[in-house]
């Protein structure tokens, strides 16, 4: 064993333990704000504990989901506007959970970077905590990995992990039938999918992230970083009201690829593309990039972030429930015999 004043340290290798500890201290209040019934431990342990009985479950089935934010992070890194990507991370996971009929219970995050910048990391994790508060789940743990040589200066990556539960026998999808009505919930923009194409379109346009937004107010970068909408509380309110047979989170693959994931093999859907107004961001991208309608529909959410498949005789009542929760609801079409999605009308 060697010793001496000139011996190497972990800090010499580029890992700042003190910065990591400072980050934990800074984010503890944000994590504490997410506490809910069932949480049994705080940050800092080797594992996090959650009591399903204390959360009100008698015979629960657990559901897990994991996701990231994709290349939307590139825009956040380049602009320094990182506060919303934590909400994106939570939304991408918990919106998937509710498609199984599950209530999100807890969330864990993974933040990786080459050099830990405490303020940047704290802003991101505070965004994660905000997403957890809005969706009713607890931020009970996470990992901050400082890995010198693995990422260019200023770059980072994120991953999220969510666990939810529902009582046995209540899992979705269930009972989807021909004639069911499709209720679409409006998106808040591009959300967190298709950003490799988004970035190509912006490059082709010649605009910068700090340029004026060509489809609305503010700057282009700010507009494209609008956080993914959280559909948890409103979707679960509809499920509890009765008559919801399935939910589809419209992410990568757009309407064309995601809705069939919750339909039986022998059923498809007819969707009227005139049932909702295409948001300006999608009009601008289609026009600027010369993107065909079919490509838009299998890449982006095109203004519909979640679809509920509901019994026809419950469609009106569930529309009222969703609108009462603050949602903009469009009646998109119906479930039909035969595979695939058939579109009528025009998107563009």
Swiss-Prot record:
Record GO terms (molecular function): ATP binding; phosphoribosylamine-glycine ligase activity; phosphoribosylformylglycinamidine cyclo-ligase activity
Catalytic activities: 2-formamido-N(1)-(5-O-phospho-beta-D-ribosyl)acetamidine + ATP = 5-amino-1-(5-phospho-beta-D-ribosyl)imidazole + ADP + phosphate + H(+)
Biochemical pathway: Purine metabolism; IMP biosynthesis via de novo pathway; 5-amino-1-(5-phospho-D-ribosyl)imidazole from N(2)-formyl-N(1)-(5-phospho-D-ribosyl)glycinamide: step 2/2
Keyword Coiled coil annotated: no
This protein's record includes keyword Cell inner membrane: no
Main location: cytoplasm
Record's subcellular location: Cytoplasm
EC number(s) reported in the record: 6.3.3.1
Keyword tags: ATP-binding, Cytoplasm, Ligase, Nucleotide-binding, Purine biosynthesis
A cellular-component GO term for this protein: cytosol
GO biological process terms held by the UniProt record: 'de novo' IMP biosynthetic process; adenine biosynthetic process
Taxonomic superkingdom: Bacteria
Enzyme class, broadest EC rank: ligase
Record InterPro entries: PurM-like_C_dom, PurM-like_C_sf, PurM-like_N, PurM-like_N_sf, PurM_cligase
Listed NCBIfam families: purM
UniProt family annotation: Belongs to the AIR synthase family.
Protein name: Phosphoribosylformylglycinamidine cyclo-ligase
Gene giving rise to this polypeptide: purM
């Amino acid at each position: 064993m060697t010793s001496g004043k000139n011996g190497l340290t972990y800090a010499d290798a580029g890992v700042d333990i003190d910065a990591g500890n400072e980050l934990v201290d800074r984010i503890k209040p944000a994590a504490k704000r997410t506490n809910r019934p069932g949480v049994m431990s705080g940050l800092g342990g080797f594992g996090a504990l959650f009591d399903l009985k204390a959360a009100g479950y008698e015979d629960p089935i657990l559901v897990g989901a994991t996701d990231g934010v994709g290349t939307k992070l590139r825009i956040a890194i380049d602009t320094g506007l990182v506060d919303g990507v934590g909400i994106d991370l939570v939304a991408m996971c918990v919106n998937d959970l509710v498609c199984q009929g599950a209530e999100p219970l807890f969330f864990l995050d993974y933040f990786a970077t080459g050099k830990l910048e405490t303020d940047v990391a704290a802003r991101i994790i505070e965004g994660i905590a905000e997403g957890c508060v809005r969706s009713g789940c607890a931020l009970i743990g996470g990992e901050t990995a400082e890995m010198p040589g693995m990422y260019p200066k200023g770059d980072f990556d994120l991953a999220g992990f969510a666990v939810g539960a529902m009582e046995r026998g209540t899992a979705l999808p269930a009972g989807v039938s021909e004639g069911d009505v499709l209720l679409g919930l409006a998106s808040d923009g591009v959300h967190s999918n298709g950003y490799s194409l988004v970035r190509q379109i912006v490059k082709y346009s010649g605009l910068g992230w700090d340029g004026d937004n060509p489809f609305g107010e503010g700057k282009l970068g700010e507009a494209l970083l609008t956080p993914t909408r959280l559909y948890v509380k409103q979707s679960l309110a509809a499920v509890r009201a009765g008559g919801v047979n399935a939910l589809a989170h419209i992410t990568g693959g757009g309407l064309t690829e995601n809705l069939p994931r919750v339909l039986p093999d022998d059923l498809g859907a007819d969707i009227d593309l005139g049932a909702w107004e295409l948001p300006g961001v999608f009009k601008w991208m289609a026009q600027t990039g010369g993107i065909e309608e079919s490509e838009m529909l299998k890449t982006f959410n095109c203004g519909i972030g979640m679809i509920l498949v509901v019994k026809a005789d419950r469609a009106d009542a569930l529309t009222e429930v969703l609108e009462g929760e603050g949602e903009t609801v469009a009646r998109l079409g119906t479930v039909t015999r035969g595979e695939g999605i058939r579109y009528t009308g025009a998107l563009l």
